[in-house]
Amino acid sequence: MGKKNTRNTKGRIIQAAWRLFYQQGYDDTTVEEIIAESGTSRGSFYHYFEGKDALLSTVSYLFD
């Protein structure tokens, strides 16, 4: 059950970031907005990503 939750949480963060980056642009999107959109916590965000730049690298790789 832990692995499924892990993938779910990370996936929700990535999907939320993609939506917000697309709608608002990378520079105008904050980590707080990504956290709110994904329904996760600040701790979860930083557990998976060092910051917004690291998240952008993942989003770019997955959606390229």
Where is each model-derived feature located?
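Nucleotide phosphate-binding site architecture
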Residues: 27, 46, 61
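Alpha-helical DNA-contacting segments of helix-turn-helix folds
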Residues: 49, 56-63
